[in-house]
Amino acid sequence: MSLRLTNTLTRRTEPFTPLTPGKASIYCCGVTVYDLCHLGHARSYINWDVLRRFLIWRGLEVTFVQNFTDIDDKILKRAAEQNSSMTEVSERNIDAFHQDMDALGILRPDRMPRATQCLDGIRSLIGELEAKGAAYSADGDVYFAVMKHAGYGKLSGRDLSEQQDNAAGRVADAEEARKQHPFDFALWKGAKPGEPSFPSPWGEGRPGWHIECSAMVRAELGDTIDIHLGGADLVFPHHENEIAQSEAATGKELARVWMHNGMVNVGGQKMSKSLGNFTTIRALLESGVSPMTLRLFVLQAHYRKPLDFTAEALEAAATGWKGLNAALGLGERYSDQLGWPSPAALSEDAIGPQTSPDAEALQALEQQFIGSMEDDLNSSGALAVLFDLAKPLRALANRLERGDEPGLPEADIRNLAPRWQLLRELAVVLGLRGETSGQSNMDDESIDATIAARKAAKAAKNYAEADRIRNELTAQGIELIDKPGGITEWIRS
């Protein structure tokens, strides 16, 4: 694999080399669960879902961790507004988050720790920093001393001395007055009346935002990970502070690669809840925008570039998805009428794309797809391959949908079957699927057993049964990827 990724830390696009060959450890900053997710969240998590899918498709064993921030001032404020509790607000919005991400076909992370579940690790990490002189107590709070960490500012390019000069003579609030430097940040916040609090060596209180992620990365993945993900708005202060506190504690690099997606803009401004110009994922879907249209809209732009949200752009994505969806559904709906082997038979090596009369052209398109994705996740280039594959399939699907004859010689129709097979496989890598798929409640063992039954049916040339099993799994949100040598991999939608 020749994957190259843009590393915010080095400001270069570099070859990706995992810490452990064949494996990748990834941490993605999750949401603060005080409200519904908006389109900016959708963009971020769709982009990183595609990164994960591509790594899996290329044979890596990926461990993907994404957190929930369930202790925060915003959650406390929302709880007060709703006459509720921090826990109740968090639980409601965690449930809503899962519903939204499932609808968009985003694979669930392998683990999703919550800040409230990691308090022991948080307190331990703060204690280590204090023992090393990188943190100090002040009136029940504990702060990280940025001047004690030589590398502070390496991710964002912030200059500490310049910030110190700018702050000189400024009238500070009570918290600023307790800090040794304007960039010092809270690791532990002393308890306030009426707010939830937790015991600690520094008194009752709650953790700061940044230390939560450092503790969860360490607990779930270790001191150093392969890739750390987030939006561009997290570079400073959140990710800068994560690096400082983690590396001050361990003396090791926190992440080899830092990746950040661009923002969604509305009228030239970043979409955000603070500006009030956001559109929730739920509102978009309830307005009739299909989940795959939204996914296609996001993937048409490079993940690092700003994405302008307009009605025209969304309509263009809807048109594009309509054509792709028609092409993807061709083999499922019309294989008998076209005289194609069943979808299960198509996955057999003997009649796959490799032996098609168009084998060279199909292989070139697959390599073009891989090349685009390996070029810093160029999803728009990868989509161009899907549209190229889909063009003759879509035209044929449209004729059949109208009740017309196929209008092609029998040999040409048969030669389109491997093309459809490749389209379906590459679409799974981008998370694009027919929208009748649901969510599976099957456990891994049941899925593996069902796939084994499908493999046995194929070996017995009982392709109708193999197709029935595949369709049953698809209906439950289990996507199958048939590979040469009779290997079948699966992922949950």
Curated annotation (Swiss-Prot):
Under NCBIfam families, the record lists: cysS
Using the UniProt record, name the top-level EC class of this enzyme in a single word: ligase
According to its UniProt record, which cofactors does this protein need?
Zn(2+)
Q: What is its main location?
A: cytoplasm
The record's subunit annotation is:
Monomer.
> What are the disulfide bonds?
none
Q: Which InterPro entries does the record cross-reference, listed alphabetically?
A: Cys-tRNA-ligase (IPR015803), Cys-tRNA-synt_Ia_DALR (IPR015273), Cys-tRNA/MSH_ligase (IPR024909), Rossmann-like_a/b/a_fold (IPR014729), tRNA-synt_1_cat_dom (IPR032678), tRNAsynth_Ia_anticodon-bd (IPR009080)
Query: What name is this protein filed under?
Result: Cysteine--tRNA ligase
- Which cell locations does it reside in? Cytoplasm
EC no.?
6.1.1.16
State the reactions this protein catalyses.
tRNA(Cys) + L-cysteine + ATP = L-cysteinyl-tRNA(Cys) + AMP + diphosphate
'HIGH' region (motif): residue ranges: 31-41
Q: Could you name the domain of life of the organism this protein comes from? A: Bacteria
Q: What GO molecular function annotations does the UniProt record carry, in alphabetical order?
A: ATP binding; cysteine-tRNA ligase activity; zinc ion binding
- Per UniProt, what is one Pfam family of this protein? tRNA-synt_1e
Asked if the Swiss-Prot or TrEMBL record annotates the protein with the keyword Aminoacyl-tRNA synthetase, the reply is yes
Query: From the record, which residues define motif 'KMSKS' region?
Result: 270-274
User: What family is reported?
Assistant: Belongs to the class-I aminoacyl-tRNA synthetase family.
For the ligand (ATP), the binding residues are K273
Annotated residues that bind Zn(2+) are located at C29, C213, H238, E242
Cofactor binding summary note: Binds 1 zinc ion per subunit.
The record, for Gene3D superfamilies, names: Cysteine-tRNA ligase, C-terminal anti-codon recognition domain (1.20.120.1910), HUPs (3.40.50.620)
Example of a GO cellular component annotation carried by this entry: cytosol
